[in-house]
Regions:
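All-alpha prenyltransferase/terpene-synthase fold signal
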Residues: 1-145
């Protein structure tokens, strides 16, 4: 369950072929859960948001959580060790299932863009109040490390 369950699923998946829903499940419960917790804790501290706004922020958090992992998988496959600050290509070397190994680079990139779009849409009703969250989304998608 939760982040620990996601990590256990990750460790158990090494060397296995996962379906896209299984990979998403794993990342929703790992990186996604951490990002979602950060967003939702901040949202709940405001005491000014209604249930619909909280739901939209939750959708935003889920979208950027998965987007972060998709981009991480793309960087592992495409970037250099010097750029990443960690060993590039380690996922493939360790036979770990990734968005790139399941979808390929082109479709993984398309998925990252779709998740970015979903995140933006979730923030539509917040107008300028969500500017920083849009900037975080852009950073996640455009980062090089």
């Amino acid at each position: 369950r939760g982040m620990a369950g996601g990590q256990a699923f990750d460790l158990d998946s090494v060397g296995k072929t996962l379906s896209l829903p299984e990979l998403e499940f794993m990342h929703i419960h790992k990186t996604g859960a951490l990002i979602r917790a950060a967003v939702m804790l901040g949202a709940r501290c405001s005491n000014r948001l209604d249930d619909q706004q909280l739901s939209r922020l939750d959708h935003f958090a889920k979208s950027i959580g998965l987007a972060f992992q998709v981009v991480d998988d793309l960087l592992d496959a495409e970037a250099t060790t010097a750029t990443l600050g960690k060993t590039a290509g380690k996922d493939a070397e360790n036979n770990k299932p990734t968005y790139v190994s399941i979808l390929g680079i082109s479709q993984a990139r398309e998925l990252a863009e779709k998740l970015q779009h979903d995140a933006y849409q979730a923030l539509d009703s917040f107008d300028e109040a969500a500017l920083r969250l849009r900037q975080v989304t852009d950073f996640i998608i455009k980062r090089k490390f």
